[in-house]
Curated annotation (Swiss-Prot):
GO cellular component assignments: mitochondrial inner membrane; mitochondrion; respiratory chain complex IV
Homology family: Belongs to the cytochrome c oxidase subunit 2 family.
Enzyme Commission (EC) number: 7.1.1.9
Binding residues for Cu cation A1: 161, 196, 200, 207
Subunit structure: Component of the cytochrome c oxidase (complex IV, CIV), a multisubunit enzyme composed of 14 subunits. The complex is composed of a catalytic core of 3 subunits MT-CO1, MT-CO2 and MT-CO3, encoded in the mitochondrial DNA, and 11 supernumerary subunits COX4I, COX5A, COX5B, COX6A, COX6B, COX6C, COX7A, COX7B, COX7C, COX8 and NDUFA4, which are encoded in the nuclear genome.
Reported cofactor(s): Cu cation
InterPro entries registered for this protein in UniProt: CcO_II, CcO_II-like_C, CcO_II_C, Copper_CuA, Cupredoxin, Cyt_c_oxidase_su2, Cyt_c_oxidase_su2_TM_dom, Cyt_c_oxidase_su2_TM_sf
Enzyme class (EC, first level): translocase
GO BP: ATP synthesis coupled electron transport
Name the record gives this protein: Cytochrome c oxidase subunit 2
Residue intervals annotated with topology Mitochondrial matrix: 46-59
Amino acid sequence: MAHATQVGLQDATSPIMEELISFHDHALMIIFLISFLVLYALFLTLTTKLTNTNITDAQEMETVWTILPAIILVLIALPSLRILYLTDEINDPSFTIKAIGHQWYWAYEYTDYGGLIFNSYMLPPLFLEPGDLRLLEVDNRVVLPIEAPVRMMITSQDVLHSWTVPSLGLKTDAIPGRLNQTTFTATRPGVYYGQCSEICGANHSFMPIVLELIPLKIFEMGPVFTL
């Protein structure tokens, strides 16, 4: 999870997040090189006296600065399109969980376990235990298995919300009257935090998401016992 003074992205807990971090580094390297070359050209322009203000035509230069940006855009677009395809791919999920956004809490339904339904509210500061995180803890965590593909079906009961867990690389809008879906496969056990990422009213900041990822064998004993 994120911590104070953190500069980089959160540690990846799914293959999709690993791909996103790699793409971030790839794009950042290209942007850094472009910025360096532009600043270097500006520096030379300001410091050298060997400038010619009478140039009216330079076909070679125009060809270069047309083709080069196109190549750079392709180098950025191709990895981005690959990740976009991976995020939309649904690979025979082992479990399906439904998340419903409300003002201002989340409701969850384990459709594969007899329709187990529960609400997840943020814990007020008075109920926090030592070591708990302010504005991020909930009364009922979402318990899911690791190393198994999980499908999240996300919708809203009232206004626009967004179900987001950064460590898993997930951000899916919850739209009234529409059922969006996303999949992920967690690679490490632990407790992971997220929040509603779509402004949804006065208490938008009080809609945390907490996932407790556990080994598959423990999960198969029954998620109801770990809530």
